[in-house]
């Protein structure tokens, strides 16, 4: 292919709206262009990458027994209301009405549609198990679309749904998908880790995330080097450690004047009370009810865990106006003593004695607060974020942390949807039973962005070989030089015969511009044809991931390039 005919408008400057590396580089390298907030056009280079990702995904889904379908993007509200998720999804769901004033949604996911589809035509155990998948655009009305393809309002996903007769069958389907996902990300040549995860709005009782590792990853995961345990911080179990001081005498509750002291650090500085001897009191709306969550002063509340404990649909922090109306004190002066709310404390807080907290009065704190004597919580639960250094819940070894990007998520749904949507089958005894389901998603467009985040350098993208838009770029230094162009097209034809995906940069540009664009786009191998090397019947061969340049005789270029690509594919 000729670069002069390829639509890839590159940019020299970093676009001001691009916050993360993948967003910057995909814009600069001419892979994507923004249509509106969170919605992007995929240009030819991106389309080539996406197709390669999709092909690998399709091959592994087919290998695992999946059958591809195409499901509707526009979904009737009745199905979502029947499942109970019309309200659960809240403002994240795009909703629309037709000319008859009937409600519809742009599908953020397809559990309702696929369950109804299968229910209509599958009635016997003889037709199960069944694995159906699609690769489709999905839509979520993110409150703040950010980070390019990482958090958009329109995105490309593969989702597969499994239908089995029982939990044992689901275990088999789940294991098939678990192994298929591992093969997919291994074939994509991405460094990744599988971690336990929360099921979120999808529901279900077991799930795993496949996280591409990246320094700038959006999510933090914790893992154990001593065993196979790993989880994202939404799911990671925080184990209770034995208290260092098993017996500590309860001291008398005391109210102290703390003018202007509103933060945990303020109290450390003002009264020399360590963070570990303080608590944070956070007020939330759980649907429409105000509740309080309490964690140790040096910890962070895990909102996902807290939401799961409460079993609510919506959880969001109360504003300071609502808090002041409740207890006449603002943020930084709150505490559980006398607080007229249901209060939930983290497990760690249940071990604390003689700790400090706000007195529900501005500029005052309590010290020597004790559970039971001074307040009684509505619940004691694991509601904090796990951090590096915590004990592994499996083997008690210390946990480590790293950052990653979620690109795959698999769920055991059980009968969550089949029961409410009445997707039943007749078993061998003629008894009607609900199908047992699983759900398995991969973010296709997100995987492309994650690959950029993981491998890019200061010069641009460095594509893994399996998903690069082209394998080789041939760069004649002077496109007006007939000898250089003749050598370029001769090599191109050789590579074409060998099945290598090649592009010739025949543009009338300076050599420096061509080199910068080649690095920016991230093609694995660059062959440079210049006057000096050509005079010696040689060309320069350079890997995108290396700085070294290798001089290769013209008659050996094809074999050398094939060998280099073979080595890169290992």
Curated annotation (Swiss-Prot):
Coiled coil: none annotated. SUPFAM superfamilies: Class II aaRS ABD-related, Class II aaRS and biotin synthetases, YbaK/ProRS associated domain. HAMAP family: Pro_tRNA_synth_type1. One of its GO terms (molecular function) is aminoacyl-tRNA deacylase activity. Keywords: Aminoacyl-tRNA synthetase, ATP-binding, Cytoplasm, Ligase, Nucleotide-binding, Protein biosynthesis. PANTHER family: MITOCHONDRIAL RIBOSOME PROTEIN L39/PROLYL-TRNA LIGASE FAMILY MEMBER, PROLINE--TRNA LIGASE. This is Proline--tRNA ligase. Consists of three domains: the N-terminal catalytic domain, the editing domain and the C-terminal anticodon-binding domain. Catalyzes the attachment of proline to tRNA(Pro) in a two-step reaction: proline is first activated by ATP to form Pro-AMP and then transferred to the acceptor end of tRNA(Pro). As ProRS can inadvertently accommodate and process non-cognate amino acids such as alanine and cysteine, to avoid such errors it has two additional distinct editing activities against alanine. One activity is designated as 'pretransfer' editing and involves the tRNA(Pro)-independent hydrolysis of activated Ala-AMP. Pfam families: HGTP_anticodon, tRNA-synt_2b, tRNA_edit. It is found in: Cytoplasm. GO terms for cellular component: cytosol. GO terms for biological process: prolyl-tRNA aminoacylation.
């Amino acid at each position: 292919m000729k670069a002069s005919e390829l639509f890839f408008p590159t940019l020299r400057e970093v676009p001001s709206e691009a916050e993360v590396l993948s967003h910057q580089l995909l814009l600069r390298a001419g892979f994507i262009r923004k249509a509106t907030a969170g919605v992007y056009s995929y240009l030819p280079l991106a389309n080539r990458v996406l197709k390669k990702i999709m092909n690998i995904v399709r091959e592994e889904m087919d290998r695992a027994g999946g059958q591809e379908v195409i499901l509707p993007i526009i979904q009737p509200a009745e199905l979502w209301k029947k499942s109970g998720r019309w309200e659960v999804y809240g403002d994240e769901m795009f909703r629309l009405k037709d000319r008859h004033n009937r409600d519809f949604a742009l599908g953020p996911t397809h559990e309702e549609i696929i369950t109804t589809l299968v229910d209509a035509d599958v009635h016997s155990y003889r037709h199960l198990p069944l694995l159906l998948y699609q690769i489709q655009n999905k839509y979520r009305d993110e409150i703040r679309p950010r980070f390019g393809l990482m958090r958009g309002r329109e995105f490309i996903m593969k989702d597969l749904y499994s239908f089995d007769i029982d939990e044992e069958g689901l275990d088999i389907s789940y294991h098939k998908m678990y192994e298929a996902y591992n093969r997919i990300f291994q074939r994509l040549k991405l460094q990744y880790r599988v971690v336990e995860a929360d099921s979120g709005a999808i529901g279900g009782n077991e799930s795993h995330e496949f996280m591409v590792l990246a320094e700038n990853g959006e999510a933090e995961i914790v893992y154990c080097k001593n065993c196979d345990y790993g989880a994202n911080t939404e799911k990671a179990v925080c184990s209770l450690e034995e208290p260092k001081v098993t017996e500590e005498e309860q001291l008398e509750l005391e109210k102290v004047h703390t003018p202007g002291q509103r933060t945990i650090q303020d109290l450390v500085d003002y009264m020399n009370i360590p963070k570990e001897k303080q608590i944070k009191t956070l007020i939330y709306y759980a649907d429409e009810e105000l509740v309080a969550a309490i964690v140790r002063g040096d910890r962070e509340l895990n909102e996902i865990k807290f939401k799961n404990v409460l079993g609510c649909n919506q959880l969001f922090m109360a504003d300071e106006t609502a808090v002041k109306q409740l207890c006449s004190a603002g943020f930084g002066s709150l505490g559980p003593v006398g607080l007229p709310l249901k209060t939930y404390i983290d497990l760690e807080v249940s071990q604390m004695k003689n700790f400090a907290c706000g007195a529900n009065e501005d500029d005052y704190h309590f010290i020597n607060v004790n559970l039971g004597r001074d307040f009684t919580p509505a619940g004691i639960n694991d509601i904090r974020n796990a951090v590096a250094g915590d004990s592994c819940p499996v083997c008690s070894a210390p946990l480590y942390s790293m950052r990653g990007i979620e690109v795959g998520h698999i769920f055991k749904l059980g009968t969550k949807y089949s029961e409410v949507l009445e997707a039943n089958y007749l078993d061998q005894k003629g008894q009607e039973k609900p199908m047992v389901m699983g759900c398995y998603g991969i973010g296709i467009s997100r995987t492309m962005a994650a690959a950029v985040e993981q491998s890019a350098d200061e010069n641009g993208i460095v594509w893994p070989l399996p998903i690069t838009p082209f394998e080789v770029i041939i760069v004649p230094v002077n496109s007006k030089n007939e000898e250089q162009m003749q050598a370029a097209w001769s090599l191109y034809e050789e590579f074409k015969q060998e099945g290598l995906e090649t592009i010739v940069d025949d543009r009338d540009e300076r050599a420096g511009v061509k080199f910068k664009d080649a690095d920016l786009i991230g093609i694995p191998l660059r062959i440079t044809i210049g006057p000096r090397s050509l005079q010696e019947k040689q060309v320069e061969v350079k890997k995108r991931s290396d700085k070294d340049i290798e001089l290769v005789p013209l008659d050996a270029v094809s074999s050398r390039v094939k060998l280099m690509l073979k080595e890169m594919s290992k």
